[in-house]
Amino acid sequence: MLFRSKGESDAGPASGIPQPHPYRDGELPDSVRVACASNGGERLDGHFGSCARFLIYQVSPAEARLIAVRPAPTIARLSVDHSVERVSLIADCALLGVLSIGGPAAARVVNSGVHPLKRSEPAEATLFLDELRAVLAGAPPPWLARIVGREPAAVAAA
């Protein structure tokens, strides 16, 4: 049995699993790979440690494309630490969208090179991805500019 955090969808694996679209590396310039913790449909509505799946998107200023759906292992809360296996599912991503993530798991995610971004409420993943696309289209913060291979915008002298 999976335990859900406040706000997490209880839809589970039976709800509609979205279909990924073909993608070849380099096809979307200035893009970043993003994992979203999901329990149902194309929603960002999961806790890192208990979500049913990770939706993997390639996101550029022009497009957010679902490129993979990776089922997460089903675990019981008292099992041996399972965050290592979950981190391996998203290791090729630069960003992780989640409703919540525990401290030790967040440390493992960050140490693997993935930057977790917590959301306060469950929502369609497209809302999160559209916000990210807008940031990429403008002047992203230096850490994000480096991830997509752009020079960080120079800070104007005061």
Model-assigned labels for residue ranges:
Residues 31-81:
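Conserved mixed alpha/beta catalytic, RNA-binding, or beta-rich assembly cores of soluble enzyme
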Residues 68-98, 104-106, 115-123, 138-139:
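Compact, charge-rich alpha-helical regulatory domains located at protein termini
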Residues 25-29, 47, 88-90:
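Solvent-exposed alpha-helices and their adjacent loops that cap or buttress functional pockets
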Residues 109:
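Extended, alpha-helix-rich binding/interface surfaces that flank or overlap catalytic cores
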Residues 114-118, 126-158:
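C-terminal binding/interaction regions
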Residues 6, 16-42:
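Entry/capping segment at the start of metal-dependent catalytic domains
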Residues 7-11:
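A general sequence property marking short-to-moderate contiguous segments
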Residues 1-2:
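Short, small-residue-biased leader/transition segments that mark boundaries at the very start
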